[in-house]
Amino acid sequence: MKNEDVGEGLVPSRYPKRKTARLKDFDYAQANTVFFITLCSLGKRQVFVRHDFNIEVVGCIKKERERVNHAVYVFCLMPEHIHLLSSPIGSGIPITRFMGGLSSQITRLSWRYGHSGRLLQRSFYDHVIRKDEDLRRIAE
């Protein structure tokens, strides 16, 4: 059996396939599409409770926003998760890459504060804001 055959057809996969939380045919790099994003800590631990750590997390959000040319309209740090309203700005860089970079930065930052291993869940929750939804209501 060749490696490329594993997980296809009648050959069972060695590992279970994870279901993706993303829409199959949606362009996550589409400019000016606004996403409501929730990024959770692993095990719902309350990791966003230290003021000094949170100040640096805000710096990570700003740094990643500039690095990949995404807008971050508003964000809210809660004890065990972060909410963001964000969108690509004509960069062609998908929201998944923005969130991957942000997650990496926050995790590395947390190591300086005594955390070890993974800090955040593997993925994030997103909701595409449709034109008929009230962006102001969601932001509040």
Label each PLM-derived region with a short phrase.
Residues 1-140:
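Short catalytic/metal-binding and nucleic-acid-binding patches
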